[in-house]
Structure formats: C-alpha cells, structure tokens
C-alpha cells in the first residue's frame, strides 16, 4: 500500500519575508493521517490556521496567498508547497511568526534541505492521488494551462520573455516528475524580477525583502547577480516550480500531465479550481497492492547523486 506521509521530526529555520523585509521563523511539525497541509500564523492571538485549499487562494498578485474569511492572510507559500509535493507530504503543520513564509534564496532548495533533515515518516493510511480522467484547459488572452490524463505526472512549460538574457532556446522545459528529478532539475531555480520593478515596489512599501540574495535580478540588458544563473533556462524552470506548488494547494499529488504557456499563479489556481469543479474529469485513487506511477521520497539519499 502507498501510505500517507508526514515529517519524522520538527524542523525550524529563519529567513526574511519578501514583502515585509522582516525576519520570519518557520517551523514545520509532523501531523496525523488525513490532517492535510495546515499553515498557522503563530504571531497572532489567537493563532490563525489556514488549510491548503484552492478556494482559499484569493491573492496571486506577486505570489500565492491564502486568505481567510476575516481577510487574514499568509503569503509566498508556493516554493515550500512545491518541496512538499516533491516528497509527497500529505500531512504537515507549518508555523510562521509573520504574514508570509520566508523567501530564503528564492528557490525551493532550502525547504528541500529542511525536509531531508526532518526525514519522512509513513502513516498507517492510504495515500490519495488526484487522477485526471479528462482534459481541462483554462485560457486568458494568449496564456493557457491545462491538465490531461497521463500515467504519471508530466510537466511541460513554455514562457515568452523578450529579453537579451533569456534566449529563445531556453524558454521551454519539460520532465516527468519524481522527488529525484525535482531536486536535481527544479529545486534550485530562483524567482526573478527587474531591478526597476523592485525599486518601484520598495518605494511603495512593498517587496521590502527583495534583493540579489533571494532572486535573479535583471536590468534591461543582463542578469545583475554576480554569480549569474544556476541553469541556462532557470527562468522557465522556476515557473514550473511555481506551478507544482500552486497545484499542490489541493493537498494531493496529481496523476496527469500539466502543460502551460505563459501561465502564472492566477491561471494555475484557476485551472485547479476548474478541474475540481468538473467532477467527471478526475477521481481520487489509492494504491493498495500495485506501485503508484510516480516516485515520492523513495531512496532520498539518492536524490543528490547524479
């Protein structure tokens, strides 16, 4: 039987909030079977909980943000969510003492490191996968995203940026998802932005934690980071990383194929909602005897071996 997973031990780290620029402490705790992914704002009294759910995503302006009925929010969850998806973590309690998850280095790699330090624990309950039975597509202008049936989890993503630092032959990427492929091929890809946009947002009191330490920063001609890019196609890889985190808001690993062109947080969330609203397009499946078509967290020590 493929079982649900949680953390083996409590893990903690600190970082900077992208939007506030203030120190954030992040703590992840094990949870019981069927608890799901729970975010907590422990800086508030009483503590406010957010359950990972696509209907709770009400702000996708600069990140993916969960907002409750009292307009209390927790922001920038997508990179951590993508790391949870990589290891198939079904149940976890995530605590922050701020309105946002720390941005860390702008990728999912620090969260992967935390999860590896914690270890993964199986729970005595079957893991539920969300399996696509029909193709669902959403579109806005020339941007689109779709999920379709596939025996595994396949992702194909294309971007279309007109910038000297983003070459035409580095704007598409695709791969079959597993913990190992995510760690090796996607987890280190960082978020990116333009120096003029960051300076403008900071003048308005936004993006106060934005810096060269947590993003690829460009001017009109080049990448400004001294160390350059981690991958030649780091931009599209990061957009795919974002999509994995956005889709995992449903709390279940997906069995299907995700394809997208110029999609972002808003369209990713719109697609997930469209799938869930069309109940004939998907089903929950468990694997009692046969192996699941996707590998999650098996032989974690192999994840850094090329």
From Swiss-Prot:
Domain of life: Bacteria
Pathway given in the UniProt record: Glycolipid biosynthesis; lipid IV(A) biosynthesis; lipid IV(A) from (3R)-3-hydroxytetradecanoyl-[acyl-carrier-protein] and UDP-N-acetyl-alpha-D-glucosamine: step 2/6
GO molecular function annotations of the record: metal ion binding; UDP-3-O-acyl-N-acetylglucosamine deacetylase activity
UniProt keyword Metal-binding, yes or no: yes
Any one GO CC term of the record: membrane
Keyword Protein biosynthesis attached: no
Cofactor(s) it depends on: Zn(2+)
Enzyme Commission number, as recorded: 3.5.1.108
Biological role stated in the UniProt entry: Catalyzes the hydrolysis of UDP-3-O-myristoyl-N-acetylglucosamine to form UDP-3-O-myristoylglucosamine and acetate, the committed step in lipid A biosynthesis.
Keywords for the protein's UniProt record, in alphabetical order: Hydrolase, Lipid A biosynthesis, Lipid biosynthesis, Lipid metabolism, Metal-binding, Zinc
Active site (UniProt): 265 (proton donor)
Classification via Gene3D superfamilies: lpxc deacetylase, domain 1, lpxc deacetylase, domain 2
Catalyzed reactions per annotation: a UDP-3-O-[(3R)-3-hydroxyacyl]-N-acetyl-alpha-D-glucosamine + H2O = a UDP-3-O-[(3R)-3-hydroxyacyl]-alpha-D-glucosamine + acetate
Protein's name according to its UniProt entry: UDP-3-O-acyl-N-acetylglucosamine deacetylase
Protein's gene: lpxC
Residues that bind Zn(2+): 79, 238, 242
NCBIfam families associated with the record: lpxC
Gene Ontology BP, a term: lipid A biosynthetic process
Protein family per UniProt: Belongs to the LpxC family.
Pfam short name (any one): LpxC
InterPro entries xref list: Ribosomal_Su5_D2-typ_SF (IPR020568), UDP-acyl_GlcNac_deAcase (IPR004463), UDP-acyl_GlcNac_deAcase_C (IPR011334), UDP-acyl_N-AcGlcN_deAcase_N (IPR015870)
